Amino acid sequence: MINYLKSFFLYEIVRGMALTLKYFFKPKVTINYPYEKSPISPRFKGEHALRRYENGEERCIACKLCEAICPAQAIVIEADEREDGSRRTTRYDIDMTKCIYCGLCQEACPVDAIVEGPNFEFASLTHTALIYDKERLLQNGDRWEQALASKLHKDYEYR
């Protein structure tokens, strides 16, 4: 009987409208994206970058740990040995369409060569533009070196 009275007096509709009015006058939580941007966490995983040492030499020692640990198999590395016995990469490609941004490559790297930077706006109209070669990754690293170094410094105690 009580259910009949509730449905007769449209109790559920009034209750729903009250809830709507409650949230209607609260401040909005959305942002106008292209013009406003929300703050990014220091642990954000965005576009990849290869870092260099202060003297300009690339950090990557071609150990291929990032290639081995990548669950999406998005990283391809080819390396040559130099005269002094050390190895350096001749090819370092990341297919960003395969990448799942898990950060395992960054965690596996013993010299902090591959990192995920602060950029999340790198959409493209072609598939080939999302296959990053070594030069593009090094350019990303040069562009964001200050931000990457401070991010790694903040995160150091958790690694």
Swiss-Prot record:
Q: Where does [4Fe-4S] cluster 1 bind?
A: 60, 63, 66, 109
Task: Kindly state a single biological-process term from the GO annotations of this entry.
Answer: aerobic respiration
Q: How does the cofactor bind to this protein, according to its record? A: Binds 2 [4Fe-4S] clusters per subunit.
Keyword Cell membrane appears in the UniProt entry: yes
Residues binding [4Fe-4S] cluster 2, per UniProt: 70, 99, 102, 105
Its Gene Ontology cellular component terms are: plasma membrane
Q: Where is the 4Fe-4S ferredoxin-type domain?
A: 51-80, 90-119
Q: Which UniProt keywords apply?
A: 4Fe-4S, Cell inner membrane, Cell membrane, Iron, Iron-sulfur, Membrane, Metal-binding, NAD, Quinone, Repeat, Translocase, Ubiquinone
For this protein, the Enzyme Commission number is: 7.1.1.-
Q: Secretion signal: which residues? A: none
List the residue ranges forming a coiled coil, or say none: none
Q: Which reaction does it catalyse?
A: a quinone + NADH + 5 H(+)(in) = a quinol + NAD(+) + 4 H(+)(out)
Principal location listed in the UniProt entry: membrane
Subunit comment: NDH-1 is composed of 14 different subunits. Subunits NuoA, H, J, K, L, M, N constitute the membrane sector of the complex.
Similarity remark: Belongs to the complex I 23 kDa subunit family.
- What name appears for this protein in its UniProt entry? NADH-quinone oxidoreductase subunit I
Q: What is the lineage of its organism?
A: Bacteria, Pseudomonadati, Pseudomonadota, Alphaproteobacteria, Rickettsiales
Instruction: Write the gene name.
Output: nuoI
